[in-house]
Regions:
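Membrane-anchoring hydrophobic helices of lipid-metabolizing enzymes
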Residues: 2-120, 155
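Catalytic core of membrane glycerolipid acyltransferases/transacylases, capturing the structured
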Residues: 114-155
Length: 155
C-alpha cells in the first residue's frame, strides 16, 4: 500500500510542481486568469462534486440562488489561490494588494500585548492573514496540519 501511495504522491507532486514552473513563467496576472478557467472546467470532474453540491444544498436549503454559479465562482477562487501560493514571498515583501480593515484595532492589540485569538477560515488565500499579523508585530502561533502528499510539504 505504501508503494502505491508513494508513486501516486510522486506523480501528483511532479504534476503540481510542473504547474508551478509554468505559473512562474507566464506570471501572476495571466496565471490567475488561466488557472481560474482550468479549475472551473476540471474541478467538477473530481469526486468532491457531489459533496460540494450536497453541502451547498444544506447551507442554502430553499433559497432560490444560482448554485451552479456559486460552485463555478468557488472553483475560480481555488484556481486563483493555487496560483497565489507560488507568489506568497512576493506578497510578503509587497502588500499593496492586501487591505486590512480595522487596522486601528490591530495596532491597539500590538500595543497592549495581551493574548488574543484570531479565527479564520479557508477564505481565498487565508495564509496571508498570519503573514500580515506577523509583519504588524503580533507574536503569533499557528496550527498547521501537513499535507498528505509529503512531496509537497517542503513547498
Amino acid at each position: 500500500m505504501f508503494i502505491i501511495k508513494f508513486f501516486k504522491y510522486l506523480i501528483e507532486s511532479i504534476f503540481i510542481y510542473t504547474f508551478f514552473v509554468f505559473i512562474k513563467i507566464i506570471g501572476l496576472k495571466f496565471s490567475r486568469i488561466l488557472f481560474s478557467y482550468i479549475f472551473i472546467k476540471l474541478g467538477p470532474l473530481f469526486k468532491s462534486k457531489l459533496l460540494i453540491e450536497e453541502n451547498l444544498n444544506k447551507a442554502l436549503q430553499d433559497k432560490n440562488l444560482n448554485k451552479k454559479h456559486i460552485i463555478s465562482k468557488m472553483w475560480s477562487n481555488y484556481g486563483k489561490v493555487f496560483v497565489e501560493y507560488i507568489y506568497l514571498n512576493r506578497f510578503k515583501k509587497n502588500n499593496n494588494h492586501i487591505k486590512i480593515k480595522g487596522n486601528d484595532i490591530l495596532e491597539k492589540l500590538v500595543k497592549d500585548n495581551k493574548p488574543v485569538i484570531f479565527i479564520s477560515g479557508h477564505f481565498a488565500n487565508f495564509e496571508l492573514m498570519s503573514m500580515e499579523l506577523t509583519k504588524a508585530g503580533v507574536n503569533l502561533a499557528t496550527i498547521y496540519r501537513p499535507l498528505n502528499n509529503f512531496f509537497l510539504n517542503p513547498f
